Amino acid sequence: MDVTIQHPWFKRPLGPFYPSRLFDQFFGEGLFEYDLLPFLSSTISPYYRQSLFRTVLDSGVSEVRSDRDKFVIFLDVKHFSPEDLTVKVQEDFVEIHGKHNERQDDHGYISREFHRRYRLPSNVDQSALSCSVSADGMLTFSGPKVQSGLDAGHSERAIPVSREEKPSSAPSS
């Protein structure tokens, strides 16, 4: 008897990227055939399903860069205006919160909310932190690093979010 060996992830129609599209930030923006018939599309072949990986990478993914001179966070917030965003620094953490109230769109009513928390390196100068949102919806949070012998200062404070008119220079994944 021949048995095909498959990784269990490919056998499950409820894998990590499937059908989570029903519950992600694109909820209410239209459905694909495989959203409605997950078991039918997975029984034909798991390899014929359209990949949602690209969609997942393009939606709400953050990138953290920490080099010798600077600490930077890039976060896709294209569904939020700067007024909908709150950025706070508490001790060694930066908290980014976005929420907009329920509003009507082409498919009904929709509301979105997210909360991200990142640990700041101990040598980031917290008095020189900045945050901005580019025209294409990319939030950039950055701060310079200080020499290890200097005190970076730790307290709670809000960071204002400014709007930039040009698109982000962050690399796309």
Swiss-Prot record:
Modified residues (N-acetylmethionine): M1
Compartment list: Cytoplasm; Nucleus
Modification type Deamidated glutamine: residues: Q6, Q50, Q90, Q147
Cytoplasm as UniProt keyword: yes
Predominant localisation class: cytoplasm
Every sHSP domain range: 52-162
Single annotated GO MF: structural constituent of eye lens
Region entry Required for complex formation with BFSP1 and BFSP2, spans: 1-63
Modified residues (N6-acetyllysine): K70, K99
Keyword entries, A-Z: Acetylation, Chaperone, Cytoplasm, Eye lens protein, Glycoprotein, Metal-binding, Methylation, Nucleus, Phosphoprotein, Zinc
Gene3D superfamilies: 2.60.40.790
Modified-residue entries (Deamidated asparagine), positions: N101, N123
UniProt GO cellular component terms: cytoplasm; nucleus
UniProt-annotated binding residues for Zn(2+) 3: H154
Residues modified to Phosphoserine: S45, S122
List of residues binding Zn(2+) 1: H100, E102
Protein function: Contributes to the transparency and refractive index of the lens. Acts as a chaperone, preventing aggregation of various proteins under a wide range of stress conditions. Required for the correct formation of lens intermediate filaments as part of a complex composed of BFSP1, BFSP2 and CRYAA.
PANTHER family attached to this UniProt entry: ALPHA-CRYSTALLIN A CHAIN, HEAT SHOCK PROTEIN HSP-12.2-RELATED
Family classification: Belongs to the small heat shock protein (HSP20) family.
Protein name (Swiss-Prot/TrEMBL): Alpha-crystallin A chain
Species assigned in the record: Perodicticus potto edwarsi (Potto)
Gene name for this UniProt entry: CRYAA
